């Protein structure tokens, strides 16, 4: 929860390239904080969380927040990370392929979470969430040019 809560704060504070980046990242951060504040169903307690609300309500808020969180991350990867300027370099095209693969992987992971929930496989949810976060991590590191030897455009000298 500490890592997710910290990531939520980071997302809410992050200023992107355009206003839509700010809106999407702020909403994603709020969803992350709600995931932390409202525990999911565990069957042990009647009231839970910081606000001591009934388990069923907390679980609904948690699940809806998780859907928004993962959905907005996927939107970020598929539509915001792939935005380009006037000139699309060959390396930007390669990065966009990575973003699309990761975004599609996240969407498939979200669909898998629905299937896991329908068939009530509790441990499967954690695994599929981890896969979705892995895809986002790859896309985020690619967007951040962490791999300068891999698909990065040369920096313009000023």
Each PLM stretch: what is its role?
Residues 1-36, 40:
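Early transmembrane hairpin module of multi-pass membrane proteins
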Residues 1-10, 67-78, 132-143:
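Hydrophobic cores of alpha-helical transmembrane segments in multi-pass inner/ER membrane proteins
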Residues 1-4, 59-70, 96-103, 126-133:
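Alpha-helical transmembrane segments of polytopic membrane proteins
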Residues 9, 70-78, 98-116:
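Hydrophobic core of alpha-helical transmembrane segments in multi-pass integral membrane proteins
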Residues 12-16, 36-43, 74-84, 114-121, ...:
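Transmembrane helix-loop junctions and nearby membrane-interface residues
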Residues 19, 55-63, 118-127:
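Membrane-helix interface and helix-disruption motif detector
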Residues 28-98:
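Membrane-proximal helix-loop-helix units in multi-pass membrane proteins
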Residues 106-158:
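C-terminal transmembrane-bundle signature of multipass membrane proteins
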